[in-house]
């Protein structure tokens, strides 16, 4: 059985279509560029020199898919070209600085009170011979200490 010209044409067309399908599904690159993973391809490029002053208070980035520049604004600025000051950000930053300052001041005062308290406790417990501590203790000393036959801390007298 000899194939007809129509059958040969269909066979050749099938081979060409199979080859085209194989090329479309191929993972090998058709160009000389190395393959790039999808996660590495960025949606942004650096702006061309013609757009270096596009953003007023920010960094210019070029959107690849939309083929137009966009801005990444510095802190405290908003807008398409970072042209507006963000007053809420300025107020929030100021309030944050005030809160930090207040926290530092309160911490320093609390630390000073703690140190003074520790010094007073040490002075009054260990060094009762200190005149200032003795005056402080004697002011708060109860007379019952004198009545029980103990030595008073303020006077070296013993009550019998």
Swiss-Prot record:
Lipidation (S-palmitoyl cysteine): 153-154
Glycosylation-annotated residues: 25
GO MF annotations, alphabetized: epidermal growth factor receptor binding; growth factor activity; receptor ligand activity; transmembrane receptor protein tyrosine kinase activator activity
Chain positions listed as propeptide in the UniProt record: 24-39, 90-160
Residue ranges that the UniProt entry lists as topological domain Extracellular: 24-98
InterPro entries per the UniProt record, alphabetical: EGF-like_dom
Subunit and interaction comment: Interacts with the PDZ domains of MAGI3, SDCBP and SNTA1. The interaction with SDCBP, is required for the targeting to the cell surface. In the endoplasmic reticulum, in its immature form (i.e. with a prosegment and lacking full N-glycosylation), interacts with CNIH. In the Golgi apparatus, may form a complex with CNIH and GORASP2. Interacts (via cytoplasmic C-terminal domain) with NKD2.
Function: TGF alpha is a mitogenic polypeptide that is able to bind to the EGF receptor/EGFR and to act synergistically with TGF beta to promote anchorage-independent cell proliferation in soft agar.
Protein name: Protransforming growth factor alpha
């Amino acid at each position: 059985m000899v194939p007809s010209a129509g059958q040969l044409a269909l066979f050749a067309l099938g081979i060409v279509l199979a080859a085209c399908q194989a090329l479309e599904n191929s993972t090998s690159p058709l160009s000389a560029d190395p393959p790039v993973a999808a996660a590495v391809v960025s949606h942004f490029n650096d702006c061309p020199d013609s757009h270096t002053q596009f953003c007023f208070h920010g960094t210019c980035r070029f959107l690849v898919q939309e083929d137009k520049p966009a801005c990444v604004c510095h802190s405290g600025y908003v807008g398409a070209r970072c042209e507006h000051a963000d007053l809420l950000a300025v107020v929030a930053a100021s309030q944050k600085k005030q809160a930090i300052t207040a926290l530092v001041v309160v911490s320093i005062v609390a630390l000073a009170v703690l140190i003074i308290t520790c010094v007073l406790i040490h002075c009054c417990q260990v060094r009762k011979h200190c005149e200032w501590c003795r005056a402080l203790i004697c002011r708060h000393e109860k007379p019952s200490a004198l009545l029980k036959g103990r030595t008073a801390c303020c006077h070296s007298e013993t009550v019998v």
